[in-house]
Regions:
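Hydrolase active-site cap/lid region
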Residues: 43-87
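Alpha/beta-hydrolase fold nucleophile elbow
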Residues: 25-36
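C-terminal catalytic histidine-bearing segment of alpha/beta-hydrolase fold enzymes
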Residues: 128, 135-179
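Alpha/beta-hydrolase active-site loop
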Residues: 1-25
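The feature captures the conserved acid-bearing segment of alpha/beta-hydrolase catalytic domains
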Residues: 70-126, 132
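Glycine-rich nucleophile elbow surrounding the catalytic serine of serine-hydrolase chemistry
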Residues: 34-46
Length: 179
């Protein structure tokens, strides 16, 4: 549990260093794309770095712990944790690596939220909850729903749909961004 926190913190710091490097090379507009648990990390990085003005989050959840606890792909992790910790405590411990507490820090950033209608790894109710959280905070995200599951997103034709939605959004958002 602690290593997960440390690994996520390190990923956000590495992203910040990458943005430092891009800015030092003259880039003025920075967008970030994260997929699956990487979407949590991308949102954390964007929430903590004002230079990231565009973010595309591909497979989403407001809570890191809920994905691990309820997702089909991480059932083995839950099995290893059950009896030692419950979801409420795990959610509290992993709150610093969860998107929900940082939603207010997304103000002024252009965002695309993508989820898969039949996702069993990132349960759909969690994805819809994050979309609603963004909307309740008046963040006006673009939303795209894939007609597939989590891993089938990587197979044609769903990978084409996903890629098209991501590239179209990033291209448009970075072109019109004047930060």
């Amino acid at each position: 549990i602690g290593r997960t926190l440390q690994a996520c913190r390190q990923a956000v710091l590495d992203t910040k260093r990458t943005v430092d490097w891009l800015v030092s090379r003259g880039y003025e507009k920075v967008g970030l794309l994260g997929t699956s648990l990487g979407s949590c990390l991308a949102m954390l990085a964007a929430a903590h770095d004002s230079r990231i003005s565009v973010v595309a989050l591909n497979h989403i959840s407001p809570f890191f712990a809920d994905v691990v606890w309820d997702g089909l792909s991480t059932a083995h992790v839950r099995t290893g944790l059950e009896g030692a910790i419950d979801l409420d405590l795990l959610r509290q411990i992993w709150l610093p690596i969860s998107p929900r507490p940082f939603i207010d820090r997304m103000k002024g950033k252009k965002s695309l939220l993508i989820y898969a209608r039949y996702d069993l790894s990132f349960p759909v109710q969690l994805s819809k909850q994050l979309v609603n959280d963004f909307r309740q905070h008046d963040l006006k995200p673009e939303v795209f729903v894939l007609p597939c599951g989590h891993y089938t997103t990587g197979k044609a034709p769903f990978s084409w749909l996903d890629g098209f939605a991501l590239v179209r959004f990033l291209r448009r958002a970075l072109r019109s961004d004047h930060h």
